[in-house]
Swiss-Prot record:
Family: Belongs to the ATG8 family.
Molecular functions (GO terms): phosphatidylethanolamine binding
GO BP term, pick one: mitophagy
Topology class, membrane: Lipid-anchor
Protein name: Autophagy-related protein 8
UniProt keyword annotations, A-Z: Autophagy, Cytoplasmic vesicle, Lipoprotein, Membrane, Protein transport, Transport, Ubl conjugation pathway, Vacuole
Residue numbers covered by the propeptide annotation in the UniProt entry: 117-124
Length: 124
């Protein structure tokens, strides 16, 4: 999925901002969070997050769920490079493994597991 944030901000500006953020807040990671285009889940009110390095993916999902005011019975999935990251993984390790060349970690979210293929688990 193409990032709207990337489309709206030139690479050099994004890289400079990520560098500035990392220097000023070395215990946090800069994250861009955007909704998967075709998902019927609510749009988030802000895209940029400064996430504590020791936050888990599960805790980050909770933050996103609260920001979009998603009811508890609705599912939410977050993706990094089109893959569901482990819920217990630290955001700092996800950042180190998947950060973009501009210095931001790009995360998308959806109400559906849009990239998972459940056919592979089908019982014959």
């Amino acid at each position: 999925m193409r990032s709207k944030f990337k489309d709206e901000h030139p690479f050099e500006k994004r890289r400079a901002e990520a560098e500035r953020i990392r220097k000023k807040y070395d215990d946090r990671v800069p994250v861009i969070c955007e909704k998967v285009e075709k998902s019927d889940i609510p749009v988030i009110d802000k895209k940029k997050y400064l996430v504590p390095a020791d936050l888990t993916v599960g805790q980050f999902v909770y933050v996103i769920r609260k920001r979009i005011k998603l009811s508890s019975e609705r599912a939410i999935f977050i993706f990094v490079d089109d893959v569901l990251p482990p819920t217990a993984a630290l955001m700092s390790s996800i950042y180190e493994e998947h950060k973009d060349e501009d210095g931001f970690l790009y995360v998308t979210y959806s109400g559906e597991n849009t990239f998972g293929d459940l056919e592979q688990y089908r019982l014959e």
